Amino acid sequence: SVAGLMPGGPYMATYYATKSYVVSLTNALAEELKRLGSHAQVHALCPGPVNTEFNDVANVKFSLKGISARECVSHCIDEADKGKIIIVPNMMVKAAVIASKFVPREIVLGILARSQKSKIER
C-alpha cells in the first residue's frame, strides 16, 4: 500500500505502520539478496487506489482517482522486470508520495488526518 510510503496515518495508525514495515522489510531483503549475488527478487507493490468490486462492497471512497486492476498488474510486471523494488503504478499517487517528501511532516499528517477522518464520519 502507498500508506507504507507516507509519514503516518492518523486514525489508521496500525494500518500505516504495518505497511511501512512491509516497505522497510522489502528494501532490506532486496539489499541482502543483492549482496548474496542471488537472482531472486523481492518487490513491494504500493498502488494507492485500485478500482475493484471490493470498493463498492465495502463502500470505500478514495481521495485520489484509482487505476484498473489490469493497469496495476501490467505496470507492476513491467517495473519488476526492470528490477524496481518499490513499485508505485499510479502517477497521481507517485506525485503525492514525492510531494510528501518536500512538504513539512505536520502538513502531510494534517492532510492525511482530514482525509481519514472524513471517511470515518461518512
Protein language model regions, located:
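Residue(s) in the substrate-gating loop at a strand-loop-helix junction
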Residues: 1
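Active-site-adjacent segment of SDR/Rossmann-fold oxidoreductases
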Residues: 6-7, 28-40
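Active-site loop-to-helix junction immediately N-terminal to the catalytic Tyr of the SDR YXXXK motif
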Residues: 7-14
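Active-site helix of classical SDR
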Residues: 18
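Extended, polar beta-sheet/loop recognition surfaces of beta-rich domains
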Residues: 38-49, 68
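C-terminal helical subdomain
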Residues: 44, 61-97
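Short, flexible catalytic-loop segment of classical short-chain dehydrogenase/reductase
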Residues: 47-57, 61-62
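Short linear elements at protein peripheries
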Residues: 112-122
